[in-house]
């Protein structure tokens, strides 16, 4: 699996991203900028009819109502990362609620360590739920600046698709060339990443 991640990192390093002039966001980032970047996460046939959220003073705020069950926003695994994503309805009922909680806590000044522990406790108590069925998260934009767990550094990452895989690990999907990469392995919000053979910019 490490070889898979290394290959993805090399692919990311070789890309020229038009989005690299903006590689992080916070509550002070203009709403119109956040909306535009959030819409890059998925095809316009989805984002034109999705709920759109922006990061505000107290966490995420719904600024555009949709009708197709998708929710698009700029997620931040860490305050320094930037991950435009569009969750389907299943993700909106489960994983996305955790993401909302995380940003609400950050807005209150809670430490990252405390937030992580609260999320773990929330899953254990049933406050938070893992996805109960298969589904997809779009992350197709050029604005993906993610944490490389191997190095602790933030890298630019190519557009990709993610599929819910609660508690999945390398043993679940196999290892070696061609095997998908698992984000948050063994956790309720684990995701299986698939990078299209010719990942393309989704800038509209």
Kindly give the residue locations of the regions a language model identified.
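Sec-dependent signal peptide recognition
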Residues: 2-8
């Amino acid at each position: 699996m490490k070889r898979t991640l290394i290959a993805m990192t090399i692919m990311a390093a070789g890309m020229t991203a038009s989005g690299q002039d903006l590689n992080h966001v916070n509550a002070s980032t203009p709403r119109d900028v956040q909306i535009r970047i959030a819409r890059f996460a998925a095809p316009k046939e989805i984002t034109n009819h999705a709920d759109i959220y922006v990061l505000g003073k107290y966490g995420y705020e719904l600024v555009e109502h949709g009708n197709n069950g998708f929710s698009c926003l700029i997620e931040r695994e860490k305050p320094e990362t930037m991950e435009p994503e569009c969750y389907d309805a299943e993700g909106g009922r489960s994983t996305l609620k955790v993401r909302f909680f995380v940003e609400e806590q950050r807005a209150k000044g809670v430490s990252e360590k405390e937030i992580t522990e609260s999320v773990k406790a929330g899953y254990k108590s049933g406050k938070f739920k893992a996805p109960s069925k298969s589904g997809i998260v779009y992350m197709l934009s050029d604005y993906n600046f993610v944490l490389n767990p191997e190095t602790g550094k933030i890298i630019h990452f190519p557009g990709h698709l993610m599929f819910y895989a609660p508690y999945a690990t390398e043993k679940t999907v196999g290892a070696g060339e061609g095997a998908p990469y698992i984000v948050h392995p063994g956790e309720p919000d684990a995701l299986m990443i698939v990078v299209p053979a010719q990942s393309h910019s989704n800038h509209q």
